Amino acid sequence: MTTKKVRVRFCPSPTGTPHVGLVRTALFNWAYARHTGGDFVFRIEDTDAARDSDESYAAILDALRWLGMDWDEGPEVGGPYEPYRQSQRREIYRDVVARLLEAGEVYEAYSTPEEVEARHLAAGRNPKLGYDNYDRDLTDAQRKAFADEGRRPVLRLRMPDEDLSWNDLVRGPTTFAAGSVPDFAITRSNGDPLYTLVNPVDDALMKITHVLRGEDILPSTPRQIALYRALMRIGVAEFVPEFAHLPSVLGEGNKKLSKRDPQSNLFLHRDRGFIPEGLLNYLALLGWGIADDHDVFSLDEMVAAFDVADVNSNPARFDQKKADAINAEHIRMLAPEDFTARLREYFVTHGYDTTLDDAAFAEAAALVQTRVVVLGDAWGLLKFFNDDAYEIDEKSAAKELKPESAAVLDAALSALEAVGDWTTPAIEAALKTALLEGLELKPRKAFGPIRVAVTGAAVSPPLFESMELLGRDRSLARLRAARDRV
């Protein structure tokens, strides 16, 4: 088994918005395939017409593309085991079901949930124990009688009367005792296949060697192993894949991260201005680490080092502050022209316009690259370049534009009006001479009113560079307006 070419799969259901737990699962599968030189198969589990949507399907594709996780087989790529959407594979499942029924691996079960509970109660058992395998040995006459009543059976797999064990690549040896897992349904009463059937059937037919998935699905593993063995006996499967159950992702209060938690929504992170490198780096840390002494690494470095055997089995908590810090590191690591291009695209997407030309925008971007945590932070720092977006923050004004700042603004205006070459060095020299030497002010007292007047805020990109980019006329006009208000 372990000598086979690694084939892993990512098989989300197209429901709702992609969440970080789903993406973490995709990342670990993708990284393991790339690390081993194997195949990353992307499959869509869209057998629930009531919940599935084309919008969610498109969102999953969008998420994978944005993150740069390419797939070797799947929708829009194709592959030897097409189709890769379960809704298009119904005939395949019906054929497998027929073969399982013919071989006696599954049987028709007519019991209703109410009848199962009643039998448990009559025997003094907990009525919520689940199915009791009652229909296993129905006679032909009993089945006919149920059918004559108009009942339509589900099909259930005969679970073996033995322990079901596997060596989980994350959790180690795992065993479910004989009799602890009842016979389970693989079809609905209308004959439609259930997830419990189609997932292992697709894995078998697509020759998936390793199943990496969330630990919440671990209780279904003994059922799937039993089904794989049945599929092997009828010639559908060649082997039982290896399993690795990834740790849960926790949210605030150490509760499992829910789809209702804002930080679980992948696209909210993108909208804030996370870059793929930062988000993927952080998601990789939810159960794995490249080394004890550093948490920041590239995707290539992750691929080179990733082994599913190194994944930690303990739950991992989503820490937004740490995610932000790692994203900030990745932003700082970008080449300046790369950061500029991404920031421009982000601004265009969100309708932000600095009104700067390309050259000036690149200079402005360079001023904030080391000052932002997410791309969205940059708009608050750069919007003052747009006269329509510029406004003086009242808290900053209350602190810096007091009556006593009039002398500072007067001196600044007088010095700057005499500047001939409107460049950063000239602006800096004029203001320092007038304010630090002339008025004998400390830098914070000297430049605080200037900064608020020019940028509208107490926190801004470097002041002198900002004034050069803003230009002489607009800088002086804002200083005069600020002087008038004090």
Swiss-Prot record:
<keyword id="KW-0547">Nucleotide-binding</keyword>
<dbReference type="InterPro" id="IPR004527">
    <property type="entry name" value="Glu-tRNA-ligase_bac/mito"/>
</dbReference>
<dbReference type="InterPro" id="IPR014729">
    <property type="entry name" value="Rossmann-like_a/b/a_fold"/>
</dbReference>
<protein>
    <recommendedName>
        <fullName>Glutamate--tRNA ligase</fullName>
        <ecNumber>6.1.1.17</ecNumber>
    </recommendedName>
</protein>
<dbReference type="InterPro" id="IPR020058">
    <property type="entry name" value="Glu/Gln-tRNA-synth_Ib_cat-dom"/>
</dbReference>
<dbReference type="InterPro" id="IPR020752">
    <property type="entry name" value="Glu-tRNA-synth_I_codon-bd_sub1"/>
</dbReference>
<feature type="short sequence motif" description="'KMSKS' region">
    <location>
        <begin position="256"/>
        <end position="260"/>
    </location>
</feature>
<dbReference type="GO" id="GO:0000049">
    <property type="term" value="F:tRNA binding"/>
</dbReference>
<keyword id="KW-0067">ATP-binding</keyword>
<dbReference type="InterPro" id="IPR008925">
    <property type="entry name" value="aa_tRNA-synth_I_cd-bd_sf"/>
</dbReference>
<dbReference type="Pfam" id="PF00749">
    <property type="entry name" value="tRNA-synt_1c"/>
</dbReference>
<feature type="short sequence motif" description="'HIGH' region">
    <location>
        <begin position="12"/>
        <end position="22"/>
    </location>
</feature>
<dbReference type="InterPro" id="IPR000924">
    <property type="entry name" value="Glu/Gln-tRNA-synth"/>
</dbReference>
<dbReference type="GO" id="GO:0005524">
    <property type="term" value="F:ATP binding"/>
</dbReference>
<dbReference type="GO" id="GO:0005829">
    <property type="term" value="C:cytosol"/>
</dbReference>
<comment type="function">
    <text>Catalyzes the attachment of glutamate to tRNA(Glu) in a two-step reaction: glutamate is first activated by ATP to form Glu-AMP and then transferred to the acceptor end of tRNA(Glu).</text>
</comment>
<feature type="binding site">
    <location>
        <position position="259"/>
    </location>
    <ligand>
        <name>ATP</name>
    </ligand>
</feature>
<keyword id="KW-0648">Protein biosynthesis</keyword>
<dbReference type="InterPro" id="IPR033910">
    <property type="entry name" value="GluRS_core"/>
</dbReference>
<dbReference type="InterPro" id="IPR049940">
    <property type="entry name" value="GluQ/Sye"/>
</dbReference>
<keyword id="KW-0030">Aminoacyl-tRNA synthetase</keyword>
<dbReference type="InterPro" id="IPR020061">
    <property type="entry name" value="Glu_tRNA_lig_a-bdl"/>
</dbReference>
<dbReference type="GO" id="GO:0006424">
    <property type="term" value="P:glutamyl-tRNA aminoacylation"/>
</dbReference>
<keyword id="KW-0436">Ligase</keyword>
<comment type="similarity">
    <text>Belongs to the class-I aminoacyl-tRNA synthetase family. Glutamate--tRNA ligase type 1 subfamily.</text>
</comment>
<dbReference type="GO" id="GO:0008270">
    <property type="term" value="F:zinc ion binding"/>
</dbReference>
<keyword id="KW-0963">Cytoplasm</keyword>
<comment type="subunit">
    <text>Monomer.</text>
</comment>
<dbReference type="GO" id="GO:0004818">
    <property type="term" value="F:glutamate-tRNA ligase activity"/>
</dbReference>
<dbReference type="Pfam" id="PF19269">
    <property type="entry name" value="Anticodon_2"/>
</dbReference>
<dbReference type="InterPro" id="IPR020751">
    <property type="entry name" value="aa-tRNA-synth_I_codon-bd_sub2"/>
</dbReference>
<dbReference type="InterPro" id="IPR045462">
    <property type="entry name" value="aa-tRNA-synth_I_cd-bd"/>
</dbReference>
